[in-house]
Structures are given as C-alpha cells and as structure tokens.
Curated annotation (Swiss-Prot):
A single MF term (Gene Ontology): ATP binding
Subunit composition and interactions: Interacts with mak-2. May interact with vhp-1. May interact with uev-3.
E.C. number: 2.7.11.24
Comp. bias intervals (Basic and acidic residues): 52-69
Protein name per UniProt: Mitogen-activated protein kinase pmk-3
Domain remark from Swiss-Prot or TrEMBL: The TXY motif contains the threonine and tyrosine residues whose phosphorylation activates the MAP kinases.
Protein modification: Dually phosphorylated on Thr-285 and Tyr-287, which activates the enzyme.
Disulphide bridges: none
Gene: pmk-3
Entries under Pfam families matching the protein: Pkinase
Species lineage: Eukaryota, Metazoa, Ecdysozoa, Nematoda, Chromadorea
UniProt record, GO biological process: axon regeneration; behavioral response to nicotine; intracellular signal transduction; MAPK cascade; p38MAPK cascade; positive regulation of axon extension involved in regeneration; regulation of 3'-UTR-mediated mRNA stabilization; regulation of axon extension involved in axon guidance
Region (Disordered): 1-90
Biased composition (Polar residues): 30-48
CDD domains: STKc_p38 (cd07851)
Organism of provenance: Caenorhabditis elegans
C-alpha cells in the first residue's frame, strides 16, 4: 500500500477505514476531535461568542424537539415529563418509525435507531438542493458511526429537479469506491400517494476541503503540506478513474464537494449534478458547476456535448488552489470568468477556433475572437512564490488546457510522475460495468417521483447501513 500523509506522521494505508464514533473524521489539524478549541491565532472574544451562540442553538433545538414531534405525528400522549422519544406510527415504504426534529427551522424525519439527542445533532449546511445534518447510528455490523442525513429540498418541484434527485439516489447506490461517498440509507416517512420528502444518508466523511482552505485563509497559517496536497490530488484522480470508467461525469468538482479525515483520506461527495455519458445526449446543461471551477468548453463552446474531460479542468483548478490557498479563477460572471482563464492559459489558437466554429457556429467564434487576445503564461513563473515541484507544474499545465481534446485524461494523469510515490495500479479500480441511469427519456415530475419511490423501495442496505430496530436484515 502507498503511504499516506497525515498531520503528524505517514500512516501505512490509503484504503479508507470505517471508524468508530470515538474517532470521528476531522481535517488534518492538531485540534481535538471531541472538543471545540480556538485555533492558535483565533480572536478569543470571537471564539467565545461563537461557543455561546452554539450552546444557545442547542438549547433551542432541545426545546423544539418535543413540540415539533407532537405537531408532526399528532401524538400528544407523553409517558412522562422527561420523555422525548416521540416516535411516529410505522410509516413510509418500509413501515419504519420516525422522530421529527426541528433544526434551523427545518423539520427532519429521523428514523428510529438514529441518535436524536439535541447535543448529538449538528447542522452541517445547506444549499439550493437540500440541507444536511450530522448524527450517529448503530450500524448492521455493530459499529456506531457518524452519518450525514441530507433532506432534499422540494425534490419534485419540476421535472428537471426531480430527475436530478433520481440521478443522485441512483448513483449513490451504484458507487462502490474508497474515495467516493455511497448511500447507507435512503428513506421517506411519506406514503406513496403523498410522497414529498426524500432523505439520503451517507457516512460523515469529515470536513470539506473548502472549510479547510478557508481555515487557512482566515487564520493565516498553512494546514496542508506539500505531501497532503499530493495525496489529495492522487485520491481525486483515483476516484475519477472509477467514475469516468463507468461513463459518468461528475460535473460539480469543487473543494466544497470533497471531504477529508484526520488521516487525509478523501471522499468525493454530492453526485446531484453527475450524469451518464453512455448515450449521445444534447441536453447537457451549461450552468452546472460552481463557476470558478468550470472549464472553458462549459462556459462557451461545446456546451451541449462536453465530456468528462471537463472534470479534469476542475481538478486543475482545485490543484492550483491547494498550492496557493486561493481560488484560481474567481470570476463574478461568465465573461469575467473566461477573461481570467485566457489571461493565464492563453486565448484559443486557430486550430481550436476552427473546432469551436465547426461544433457551434461562426457567431460563437466571432464572440470569442472579440475578446482581448492573451498568450499563455509560463506556469513556473506564475506559481514560483509557492515553490511547486517541476512535476506539479507539469501536471497542472496538462490539466489546464483550453482544448479538451488535448487535455490530460484521468488514465494518463494517474500515471503522471508527480503521483509516482502513491501510484498502485492494482489498487486503482475501474467500475466493473457501465452505469445505466435510465434517465435520458423525458418524464413528468410525477413520473420521476414514481421512479424515486421505486429506488427507495428497492434499496439494498449495506453492512455499514444503520440498523433498523426490530427488523430483520433485508
């Protein structure tokens, strides 16, 4: 096995371990896993204020549990004044019991067997597609694990959104890789005729790379060493090799969708924007990624037929940010984004302009030609202040290429000299089959809802899935 960098030493395996709750995942820092402590350079008063706010939030959450559970279940009968385990009657496709808990004014249905104590639940964040909390549960293999519960936001609002939910629930069941998150549970408390809420449970994989990079910027001290950076890049490529071999494009690679443990084990998260490339499809959308990590062909040309090489561009943006600590192309809107890209990577040459015209139109070519022309800069000069290795610069130059047909592939990248110390071909798996998502046909939002219901009904739990009390393993 290749060695793995950590905050204080180099452990011996890069295969992800399923850890007990006593050793929760955390970023590679020397901060305690079990106590909230201020960083060395953190302002004490600010930290104390944040701790008081967190305690107040926990107190409010505790007060809301009983009230919201009663409202959601209609059960006003209490065993005693201290009783807080108010469970619904068996409901949903598998007739499970739930406790309804209010977190940040959002009601979460948490299945029986999961920890619902106020101090055990943590709100991790939310976005346009859902909200995520962290708790723990005893799993089928007997271990108690930290898990992340994602409640999808308005999953069946329209056909486009409903198809996205279907893809994510489908892919999280298909993915089986050390560096890729997978579904440990998929459930709903609703009945089929009133199916509205979808929950997906995954392992809690640690803090996001975005949070770690932000910590570096906020506290003014570097957390990730050169060895960390190299190992992170290797693991992303290792995961992309598997994803791309299944003819899947992730489409949303960014620091916020990557998580790290204390041992620097990496997991790719959130497959809500991923999709299959198995069949020719002209419905690939332009505005899928966070703009800063979008490839030029996603921003302007080939917007209907870009390939998984767009993921490789995103990897280049992430690699550069790992080196410098700052986003590489922080554009405010598409035109500004494109200008930032060409200022570093150069404007399209005649060969690429011809491809753009052939694949799109002369009008698109004319627009691109109207921008200020830039020559590609010397990456060694641009990044010299950060003392990167020659191999790092060489890989970065091959990732950040305007013409996707000349961009390095994942199969080539994993063999690059920069990653030689971690490369282990026999432990860099490909998918054993092409993933057919059955999502290319147009459907109504109700038809997509029916498809998601079937995914929940047919979900096969893993050995690491939370145990359902009193129910035989399925």
């Amino acid at each position: 096995m290749a060695s793995v960098p950590s905050s204080s030493s180099l452990p011996v395996s890069h295969v992800r371990r399923h850890e007990d709750v006593s050793t929760p995942s955390a970023p590679p820092t020397k901060r305690s896993n079990n106590q909230s402590q201020p960083p060395e350079s953190y302002e004490p008063n600010t930290w104390l204020q944040q701790q008081r706010e967190q305690e107040q939030q926990k107190k409010l959450a505790a007060e809301n549990i009983k009230k919201q559970s009663i409202e959601a279940t209609g059960n006003n009968e209490m065993v005693g004044e201290e009783e807080e385990d108010i469970l619904s009657k068996p409901c949903g496709p598998h007739k499970r019991r739930f406790q309804f808990v209010m977190i940040r004014n959002i009601t979460f249905a948490i299945p029986e067997g999961y920890d619902v104590e106020p101090n055990s639940i943590e709100y991790l964040g939310g976005g346009s597609f859902g909200n995520v909390i962290k708790t723990s549960a005893v799993c089928r293999d007997g271990l108690r694990r930290y898990v992340a519960i994602k409640k999808m936001r308005e999953p069946f609002f329209d056909p486009h959104h409903a198809r996205r939910i279907f893809r994510e629930t489908k892919l999280l069941q298909l993915m089986r890789h050390d560096n890729i998150i997978c579904a440990l549970d998929i459930y709903t408390p609703d009945e089929e005729n009133d199916f509205r809420d979808v929950y997906v449970v995954t392992e809690f994989a640690g803090r996001s790379l975005y949070q770690i990079l932000k910590q570096q910027r906020d506290y003014g001290r570097r957390v990730l060493t050169d060895e960390h950076i190299k190992f992170i890049i290797y693991q992303i490529i290792r995961a992309l090799k598997y994803i791309h071999s299944a003819n899947i494009i992730h489409r949303d690679l960014k620091p916020g969708n990557l998580a790290l443990t204390d041992d620097s084990d990496l997991m790719i998260l959130d497959f809500g924007l991923a999709r299959s490339l198995e069949k020719k499809d002209t419905s690939l959308t332009q505005y899928v990624q966070t703009r800063w990590y979008r490839s030029p062909e996603v921003i302007y040309w080939k917007i209907d037929s870009y390939t998984n090489l767009a993921d490789m561009w995103s990897l280049g943006c992430i690699a550069a940010e790992l080196l410098t600590g700052e986003p590489l192309f922080p554009g405010d809107e598409p035109n500004a984004q494109y200008q930032r890209i060409t200022q570093l990577c150069g404007s399209p040459d005649e060969e690429l302009l011809t491809k753009i015209e052939n694949d799109n139109s002369s009008a698109i070519k004319a627009v691109i030609q109207s921008y200020t022309t830039h020559k590609r800069r010397n990456f060694r000069d641009v990044f010299s202040a950060h003392n990167p290795s020659e191999d790092f610069i060489d890989l970065l130059e091959k990732l950040l290429v305007l013409d996707p047909e000349k961009r390095i592939t994942v199969e080539e990248a994993i063999q690059h000299p920069y990653l030689a110390e971690f490369s282990l071909p026999e432990d860099e798996p490909r998918a054993d089959h092409i993933f057919d998502l059955d999502d290319s046909q147009a459907r109504t939002r109700f038809e997509w809802r029916d498809a998601v219901w079937k995914e929940i009904m047919n979900y096969k739990r893993l050995s690491s899935s939370p145990l359902i009390p009193g129910e035989a393993d399925r």
